[in-house]
């Protein structure tokens, strides 16, 4: 039985799980969210596009199924590129970005970058800034990119803000340019300073780690990165990203401070 498990687990991880599309619905009422403001958001996180695991046909299928949900707004939460050795054919970024450009929602499609979208761009790692070629591909496809910026929207006669921060692990240590530690390019304070009224705020942040720094002004923080714990066997997560907090691995998390609800 132990040997069967040792063989079947990798087989499932390589041959089955990457080809499954997991669709999860949440019905939330975040704090400071107006009673009459009904917003249906579709979230796409961590597609890691590459052959054979996430080819263009799968991206096309995800776009089609997302559009079929008829969301009001579509939010893309980063890590569009695989950036690892377990692929036999990287896919040109404009090819998949153009497919994501076919996403359709009345309030549009909006994106942030993830750590792999920075790590896989050697020029961006050297210069310490963007635009990355993956971010540029999204812009070319007509998808606005949120790198420490906020934008106001109106729906059903009520306003809300969408904010997005740049990646918290964007720049790796780099001996050639004497960068000795990880460097994030996120600016939470500067991003939220762009919010000019008391309308509720949705915040896109690729890594969920920042939630403890997010002020109560934000109604809901939306993240990817954790892949539900990477490997999640009945709650056991042996391959969870070391820089992330395990309690933020999956689902809808409500943070509290003492007995007071603090943030979602």
Question: What name fits each language-model region?
Answer:
Residues 42-45, 73-79, 108-115, 146-149, ...:
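Active-site neighborhood of phospho(di)ester-bond hydrolases with catalytic His/Asp-centered motifs
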Residues 202, 207-264:
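Conserved beta-sheet core of the metallophosphoesterase superfamily
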Residues 47-49, 80-83, 115-119, 151-153, ...:
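Solvent-exposed loop/turn segments at secondary-structure junctions
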Residues 35-144:
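Membrane-embedded segments
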Residues 30-42, 143-144, 150-163, 254-261:
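Beta-strand-turn-beta hairpins that frame and shape the catalytic cleft
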Residues 1-32:
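N-terminal membrane-anchoring alpha-helices
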Residues 121-143, 155-201, 211:
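Binuclear metal-dependent hydrolase catalytic cores centered on His/Asp/Glu-rich metal-binding motifs
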Residues 38-51, 159-169, 202-205, 259-264:
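Active-site-proximal beta-strand elements of phosphoester/diester hydrolases
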